[in-house]
Swiss-Prot record:
Record note on quaternary structure: Component of the ubiquinol-cytochrome c oxidoreductase (cytochrome b-c1 complex, complex III, CIII), a multisubunit enzyme composed of 3 respiratory subunits cytochrome b, cytochrome c1 and Rieske protein, 2 core protein subunits, and additional low-molecular weight protein subunits. The complex exists as an obligatory dimer and forms supercomplexes (SCs) in the inner mitochondrial membrane with cytochrome c oxidase (complex IV, CIV).
GO cellular component: matrix side of mitochondrial inner membrane; respiratory chain complex III
GO MF term list: ubiquinol-cytochrome-c reductase activity
Function: Component of the ubiquinol-cytochrome c oxidoreductase, a multisubunit transmembrane complex that is part of the mitochondrial electron transport chain which drives oxidative phosphorylation.
Main subcellular location: mitochondrion
Annotated family: Belongs to the UQCRB/QCR7 family.
Pfam family, one: UCR_14kD
Membrane topology (UniProt): Peripheral membrane protein
Record's keyword terms, sorted: Electron transport, Membrane, Mitochondrion, Mitochondrion inner membrane, Respiratory chain, Transport
GO biological process terms on file: mitochondrial electron transport, ubiquinol to cytochrome c; mitochondrial respiratory chain complex III assembly
Localization terms from the record: Mitochondrion inner membrane
Record-given protein name: Cytochrome b-c1 complex subunit 7
Coiled coil region boundaries: none
Amino acid sequence: MPQSFTSIAKIGDFILKTPLLSKICVPVSKQYIKYSGYRKLGLRFDDLIAEENPIMQTALKRLPEGESYARNYRIIRAHQSELTKHLLPRNEWVKAQDDVPYLLPYILEAEAAAKEKEDLDNLELSKK
């Protein structure tokens, strides 16, 4: 069973709260982000999350219209850059301070709603 975004967020919070793990994992993650190169294509981290599951589809529907258009523009521009085998100019790269999780709150909200729906669907009533 794949991990939920809620469990991944909890693991991330645990790592950041633990000083030893934070000293090890944060520099490694920064290097990973640097070498992955998605910021050089103008993408943010949340643009990389696969859209093919119902939770993500629900989260994308809840995304504000302006942010949704910006997301689609970033993805189309990145595809165009890949097709032409060129990176964006350095001034158009996404900076670290601009790469904030804009979609994660909606994903966590959609997961909570799906879990609540599943719990209610599997509810068993008993007589006392």
